[in-house]
Amino acid sequence: MENRWQVMIVWQVDRMRIKTWNSLVKYHIYRSKKARGWFYRHHYDHPNPKVASEIHIPFRDYSKLIVTTYWALSPGERAWHLGHGVSIQWRLGSYVTQVDPFTADRLIHSQYFDCFAETAIRRAILGQLVAPRCEYKEGHRQVGSLQFLALKALISERRHRPPLPSVAKLTEDRWNKHQRTKVHQENLTRNGH
C-alpha cells in the first residue's frame, strides 16, 4: 500500500509570537474570562510530537475553530527561520477546512467580543442604546461607511491591556521586513565635549 500524504497550510511564525499568542489566550480564558468556552490543549496532551499547543474556539452553530501551533518543523528559507508554524482549521461535524487568519479573526469577532458595528448607525438614529466601542478591531479591517466613520471618531479610543488575541497578528510576516535600528546619541558630557 502506498503512503497517503495530507497537505496542510502552515503559516511560518516566529517562536516569540507563538509564546505571546499562547499567554494572551490563557490570560483571556482564565483571568479576564472574555474567551469563555475556549479550550487550551497543551503539547503533552497531544499525541503528535510536533504540536506545541492547540486552541479550540467553539461557535454557536456547533462549529469550532482550531488554531494549532507547531514546533520542530523543517527549517524555512533562511537560516533564522526556525521550524515554528501555525495552522488554522474550521470544523463542523466531520467537515474540516483550512481558514486564512483574517477569516479566523472575523469569525472570532462575530461571536465573542463586544462590537461597535454597522448596525450602530441605524440604532443611534432610532435613539436606541449603542455599544460604546469595538473590543476586537482585528475582526473587521474594511473601511466603513461615512456615517460609521463619523460615529467612530466621536467615541474616544480606549486601549485594552493586555490586547485580545488576533490570529492575523500571530501569522503576520516579520522576517522579510527591514528592521529599523535605533541610533543612540552619544552622551556629550561623558565624551568630554
Curated annotation (Swiss-Prot):
At which positions is motif HCCH motif? 109-140
Q: What is this protein called?
A: Virion infectivity factor
Q: What else is known?
A: Vif-defective viruses show catastrophic failure in reverse transcription due to APOBEC-induced mutations that initiate a DNA base repair pathway and compromise the structural integrity of the ssDNA. In the absence of Vif, the virion is morphologically abnormal.
Which residues does this entry mark as bearing Phosphoserine?
145, 166
Which Gene Ontology CC terms are recorded?
host cell cytoplasm; host cell plasma membrane; membrane; virion component
Print the keywords alphabetically.
Answer: Host cell membrane, Host cytoplasm, Host membrane, Host-virus interaction, Membrane, Phosphoprotein, Ubl conjugation, Ubl conjugation pathway, Virion
Q: Where is this motif: BC-box-like motif?
A: 145-154
Predominant place of localization:
host cell
Tell me the name of the encoding gene. Answer: vif
- Tell me how this protein assembles: Homomultimer; in vitro and presumably in vivo. Interacts with viral Pr55Gag precursor and host APOBEC3G. The interaction between Vif and APOBEC3G is species-specific, which may play a role in restricting the replication of SIV to their host. Forms an E3 ligase complex by interacting with host CUL5 and elongin BC complex (ELOB and ELOC).
Region RNA-binding: start and end of each range? Answer: 75-114
Coiled coil ranges: none
Function (record text) = Counteracts the innate antiviral activity of APOBEC3G. Forms a complex with host APOBEC3G thus preventing the entry of this lethally hypermutating enzyme into progeny virions. Functions as an adapter molecule, recruiting APOBEC3G to the ubiquitin-proteasome machinery. Targets APOBEC3G for degradation through the assembly with elongin BC complex, CUL5 and RBX1. Binds viral RNA and affects the stability of viral nucleoprotein core. May play a role in viral morphology.
Species in which this protein is naturally found: Simian immunodeficiency virus (isolate CPZ GAB1) (SIV-cpz)
Pfam families this protein is in? Answer: Vif
Which InterPro entries does this UniProt record tie to the protein? Vif
How does the protein's chain sit in the membrane according to the entry?
Peripheral membrane protein
Q: Where is the stretch described as Membrane association?
A: 171-172
* Positions of region (Multimerization): 152-165
The keyword Transmembrane helix belongs to this UniProt entry's keyword annotation: no
Phosphothreonine occurs at 97, 189
